[in-house]
Structures are given as C-alpha cells and as structure tokens.
Amino acid sequence: MGRSLKKGPFIADSLLRKVEKQNDTDDKSVIKTWSRASTILPMMIGHTIAVHNGKSHVPVFITEQMVGHKLGEFAPTRTFKGHIKDKKGGR
C-alpha cells in the first residue's frame, strides 16, 4: 500500500539539504547517506548518492526512470552465492 498523497513523499532532511546545496552551487560530488527509505525526487536527477547497504556505501547515479522509487531499491543488501551442488551418489 502506498503513502497518503496528503503527506507527500518521505525524504530525510539532511539528504534534502545536501541536494539543495549542491543544486545551488552546481557541485556534483558524491553524497553519502544511510537513508535507504528516502524517495527519489526530480531535483536529484544527475546526482550520485552513495547509499549504505549495511556494509559499505554503494554509489547510485540518479536518472529520470528512478524518480518515485526509494534509494534502498538500488543498493542490494544480500549477496547470492549460488545454490549448493548435489553430492554425487547421495545415500
């Protein structure tokens, strides 16, 4: 179920301030954040945001198709190493 329209999208205040500051100064340095729940807004297009995945920060370049999604969707937290092969012979 989606978020109520009267509330608007969630974005962390610190992240919003950093993006607005970079838009004012035309700076495109990487923004580091732990806020995976923040919604991607149109003002973020063209920025690179390093999203924390629990171990390290994964750089995510924001494009138009990402608007409306959450930052955490683009920084996977689990690594799949493959299924275990069956033992030959078994029982």
UniProtKB/Swiss-Prot annotation:
Cellular compartments per GO CC: cytoplasm; small ribosomal subunit
Lineage top rank: taxon: Bacteria
Any single GO molecular-function term of the entry would be:
structural constituent of ribosome
Any keyword RNA-binding?
Answer: yes
Query: SUPFAM superfamilies annotated for this entry?
Result: Ribosomal protein S19
> Which keywords belong to this entry?
Ribonucleoprotein, Ribosomal protein, RNA-binding, rRNA-binding
Among PROSITE patterns, the record links this protein to:
RIBOSOMAL_S19
Which regions span the lipid bilayer? none
The chain's disulfide connectivity reads: none
Q: Name one GO biological process term.
A: translation
Instruction: Name the job this protein performs.
Output: Protein S19 forms a complex with S13 that binds strongly to the 16S ribosomal RNA.
Q: Which family does it belong to?
A: Belongs to the universal ribosomal protein uS19 family.
Protein name in UniProt: Small ribosomal subunit protein uS19
Natural source organism: Parasynechococcus marenigrum (strain WH8102)
Provide the organism lineage as a comma list. Answer: Bacteria, Bacillati, Cyanobacteriota, Cyanophyceae, Synechococcales
